[in-house]
C-alpha cells in the first residue's frame, strides 16, 4: 500500500549521452542535479541509464545517486527499475521503485524503505520532476 510522500525531486539534466544501441532499443545516459524537499530534503547528483524502445514511445532503465541532506548527511540511492511512456515528443511519464542506504542514525529508517516514484522527464528542456512515496508493509 502506498504510504506517505517521502520527497519531491526537481532537477536539471546536466548531461544527456546517446550510447550505442542495445537489444532493447536506444540507450541513453542521463546525469542530473536536483533539489529535494519533503520528509527528506537536500540535493542530489544522479546517473540514470535509460533505453527507449524502437517504437520511440516506451522504455525503461535504472539509476543510482547520492543525496546530501540539508543536515549534511549522505544517502545512497538506487533505482533498480523504472518504466516510462511518451506523452509528447521528448517528454515521458515515468514510474518505478527506489531503495536507500545510509549510515546516518537519524535516517537509518530509510534502509528498510522501498520507495515508489512517479514523475516526468522532459528531454527537450532537460528537466525532471519526481514524487517518491513509501511503499508500506501490510499491517
Regions found by a protein language model. Give the residues of each.
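Beta-strand-enriched cores of mature, soluble protein domains
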Residues: 1-139
